[in-house]
Regions:
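Short, small-residue-biased leader/transition segments that mark boundaries at the very start
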Residues: 1-2
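Beta/alpha (TIM)-barrel catalytic core signal, keyed to glycine-rich beta->alpha loops juxtaposed to Asp/Glu
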Residues: 24-227, 231-235
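Phosphate/pyrophosphate-binding loops at sites that engage ATP/ADP/AMP, CoA/4′-phosphopantetheine
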Residues: 5-14
Length: 236
């Protein structure tokens, strides 16, 4: 497996705590897709071979744990079965999208990972910044959504603008910023191990961190559930 020691030197570390595989190599719904299409089938490296290569890095002390990203139940099951059958390192986490607009995780992946004790590390809790409300105020506001054409396909689906507006109004009614509501929702989920946040300014970073101490109530939980039922998972 290609893993250059100078990568660790450039990172100024002796090892990587969690080494994640960013995307499945096989045919599976990605980049805003939500339907599996067998017609797109293509060859892929068996999970056992991948784990064997990663096991060498674990044995060498270059990485400590292995995680997956953008994964589905079948793929995760293959990695867990290979680890169990061939005494290879076990996957400890999955980094998948999770937010008020994308709660796909709560179906099959939630039960699977809870029973297998696999941690969720959600990314895009702010849905590419949409849940900050900035695009409601200025549709051409600077950001990935406006600067990179086609970059945020899952957030261009029907129902997304309406859901964003509803969550922003809910936040205002409870004395929160839209960003605080979006992040506190993710922080308050019992199955979330840690959250990946992003910021382009110190002010944004401060707001992200302050969301941890934002209040969360049963009334707020119910209001979020009501909005979800109206615009159900608009950005899978």
């Amino acid at each position: 497996m290609l893993f250059r020691s100078d990568w660790l030197r450039r990172l100024q570390t002796d090892y990587i705590d969690l080494y994640q595989l960013h995307w499945p190599e096989r045919n599976t719904p990605m980049f805003g897709e939500f339907v599996y299409d067998p017609a797109k089938e293509r060859p892929f490296t068996p999970p056992r071979e991948t784990l064997e290569a990663l096991a060498e890095l674990v044995d060498e002390g270059k990485i400590r744990h292995i995680g997956l990203s953008n994964e589905w139940p079948w793929g995760l099951m293959q990695f867990l079965n290979a680890a169990r059958e061939y005494q290879l390192p076990r996957v400890v986490s999955v980094q998948n999208p999770y937010s008020l607009l994308n709660r796909t995780w709560e179906t099959a992946m939630l039960e699977f990972c809870h029973r297998e004790q696999i941690a969720l590390l959600p990314y895009s809790p702010m849905a590419f910044g949409l849940l900050s409300g900035k695009y409601l105020r200025n549709p051409q506001a600077r950001g990935r959504v406006t600067e990179f054409d086609g970059f945020a396909q899952r957030y261009s689906k029907p129902g997304v603008p309406e859901a964003v507006a509803a969550y922003a109004a809910l936040a205002e009614a409870h004395g929160l910023s839209p960003a605080q509501l979006a992040l506190k929702f993710v922080y308050s989920r019992w199955f979330v191990a840690s959250t990946i946040i992003g910021a382009t300014s110190l002010a944004q970073l401060e707001e992200n961190l302050n969301a941890w101490d934002a209040p969360w109530s049963e009334a707020l939980e119910q209001a979020v559930a009501d909005i979800r039922l109206r615009w159900f998972n608009p950005a899978p």
